[in-house]
Amino acid sequence: MEQQWLSATLKSEDGDVYARFAYHLRDVLSDSQFSRAVWSQLEALPTADLDDYMRDLDELEDAVKCGMERIHGCTMLLVLTGAGYRDLVFALRDDAEAIEEAIQSLAAEHPNRLHTKVYQGPKFGPFEALVSRVAAT
């Protein structure tokens, strides 16, 4: 399957947020097997150089994405980049096991730079509206 990412700029009270949505995976939003969401917030290392800042976030995103996708049933759907952070939103299958332990292990590899929470709930947890909004832009 060819990867296709949609991009949008969302307005928020904290400023503009640049969003990327994995359009090629949009069917996950209506798949009843994906009823949990994993939200990971990444923090960049302090730097005065914008290129270094973005490179650092890109490298951390790649490491987290690879780590989460090694977990059975985790699929990255949405990336949000704002001032000083990048959030990754993953869909998680109901049958994924040991997710909390895997996340703790991944966070230990990146101390104080990765904050992750698993959300339970139907229709991709509380983020269905956000993911759908980005997908519709």
Residue ranges of model-derived segments:
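Charge-rich, low-complexity segments
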Residues: 1-65, 69-75, 83, 93-97, ...
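Short, surface-exposed, polar/charged, turn-prone segments marking secondary-structure boundaries
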Residues: 40, 67-69, 106-107, 116-120
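Generic structural motif
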Residues: 76, 95, 114-118
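Short Gly/Ser/Thr- and Asp/Glu-enriched loop/turn motifs at secondary-structure junctions
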Residues: 80-86
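Short beta-strand->loop micro-motif that forms the acidic, two-metal-ion catalytic signature
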Residues: 88-90
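Short amphipathic alpha-helices in soluble, non-transmembrane regions
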Residues: 99-109
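Conserved short beta-strand edge segments in small beta-sheet-based binding/regulatory domains
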Residues: 108-137
